[in-house]
């Protein structure tokens, strides 16, 4: 199964949007393999966003993601899951995100864009390993409704 890491950022948690956002992924048929509320510390934030180090927005991003609790989740599905998740999340800038996407429906500002999602299957695996220990994940568990979602 292909996996993507999701981070419901501090603005999503503070605005009480956890349930509304999580339910979209469930309703789409994706399986949650891990889900937790946590406070990201500076070291973890820098590790996760290492590819952006040196960019003008990096320090602000670290400060923001560590400012309040976040919800971190791993969703899994058939090949193409990461692309599907990215489509559901919408454009980085909520002002340019299509209606029907998470950012298009709930977002207002690029600096408070609600959610992070892995941008490739490789990133999904790398990011999952940053936030979850293997024992915290439930692998390929069976749901009775899977036959109604996947051929």
UniProtKB/Swiss-Prot annotation:
PROSITE patterns: NDPK, NDPK_LIKE. GO terms for cellular component: cytoplasm. One of its GO terms (biological process) is UTP biosynthetic process. It is an enzyme of class 2 (transferase). The active site is at 116 (pros-phosphohistidine intermediate). GO terms for molecular function: ATP binding; metal ion binding; nucleoside diphosphate kinase activity. It catalyses: a 2'-deoxyribonucleoside 5'-diphosphate + ATP = a 2'-deoxyribonucleoside 5'-triphosphate + ADP; a ribonucleoside 5'-diphosphate + ATP = a ribonucleoside 5'-triphosphate + ADP. Keywords: ATP-binding, Cytoplasm, Kinase, Magnesium, Metal-binding, Nucleotide metabolism, Nucleotide-binding, Phosphoprotein, Transferase. The keyword Transcription regulation does not apply. InterPro entries: NDK-like_dom (IPR034907), NDK-like_dom_sf (IPR036850), Nucleoside_diP_kinase (IPR001564), Nucleoside_diP_kinase_AS (IPR023005). Homotetramer. Major role in the synthesis of nucleoside triphosphates other than ATP. The ATP gamma phosphate is transferred to the NDP beta phosphate via a ping-pong mechanism, using a phosphorylated active-site intermediate. This is Nucleoside diphosphate kinase. It comes from Chloroflexus aggregans (strain MD-66 / DSM 9485). The gene is ndk.
